[in-house]
Amino acid sequence: MQRLAKIISNAGICSRRDAEKLILEGQVKVDGITILSPATNVDISNQIEVSGILINQSQKPRLWIYYKPVGLITTHKDPLSRKTVFEQLTGLPRVISIGRLDLNSEGLLLLTNSGDLARQFELPSNRLKRVYHVRAYGKSDILLKSDYKNLEIDGIFYNPHSIKLFKQNKSNSWFEVVLFEGKNREIRRIFEYFGLKVNKLIRIQYGSFTIDNLKPGAYKEINNKILEK
């Protein structure tokens, strides 16, 4: 037996928190009966519907690498009616994202049909490497010569693993930034703190997975044998 919200999340419908909201809103049925308690326990023999859609409890975990373009937000529904990642994806089953990229960021976004798999990737204790290429306007010397480890900005501590300059011209500089635990808008806030304006941010790696030659909007599925490792 497992909690109903967990089963919904594991099926790739949404996060566990969003699943709890759907239950409280009366959008979930078990064996034809509307359930209003997120604490309800179910098993594989129960038939579960979410917003009229029957979910598959026995599906195998799958993983995709997706090149998120600029201009999409990483959510299933946006109260401001902005375009979302999931509205643009075609040919995929119901999936959730592993982590997020903000509206103006692009690059590697991992997608999965398994809530459990998503949580394994997102656990801070697993310390999965995230690599970003960042283009910024301003004087790079201040950032590169500063101690940016354990940096406190507006009461939040940031601890990037490394920030290295790899290309520079008259107007912009390119940096490679490595994180092992990403916080909301972390890179943009660190750069802004040191007087640099980020005008392009691309995630090129998450864990052992890289963006390779994918074009914006394209995706590819990871082989199950690689996933099992």
UniProtKB/Swiss-Prot annotation:
Alphabetized GO MF terms: RNA binding; rRNA pseudouridine synthase activity
> What EC designation does it have?
5.4.99.-
Please identify the protein, giving its name as recorded.
Uncharacterized RNA pseudouridine synthase RF_0863
InterPro entries hit by this protein = PsdUridine_s_RsuA/RluB/E/F_cat, PsdUridine_synth_cat_dom_sf, PsdUridine_synth_RsuA/RluA, PsdUridine_synth_RsuA/RluB/E/F, PsdUridine_synth_RsuA/RluB_CS, RsuA_PseudoU_synthase, S4_RNA-bd, S4_RNA-bd_sf
S4 RNA-binding domain mapped to chain residues: 2-69
**Per the UniProt entry, what is one GO biological process?**
enzyme-directed rRNA pseudouridine synthesis
Q: Does the keyword S-adenosyl-L-methionine apply?
A: no
> Which residues participate directly in catalysis?
D102 (nucleophile)
In terms of superkingdom, the source organism counts as Bacteria
Reaction(s) the record says it catalyses: a uridine in RNA = a pseudouridine in RNA
Q: Cross-referenced SMART domains, in alphabetical order?
A: S4
- Keyword ATP-binding included in the entry's annotation: no
Q: Which Pfam families match?
A: PseudoU_synth_2 (PF00849), S4 (PF01479)
Instruction: Identify the keywords attached in UniProt to this record, alphabetized.
Output: Isomerase, RNA-binding
Homology family? Belongs to the pseudouridine synthase RsuA family.
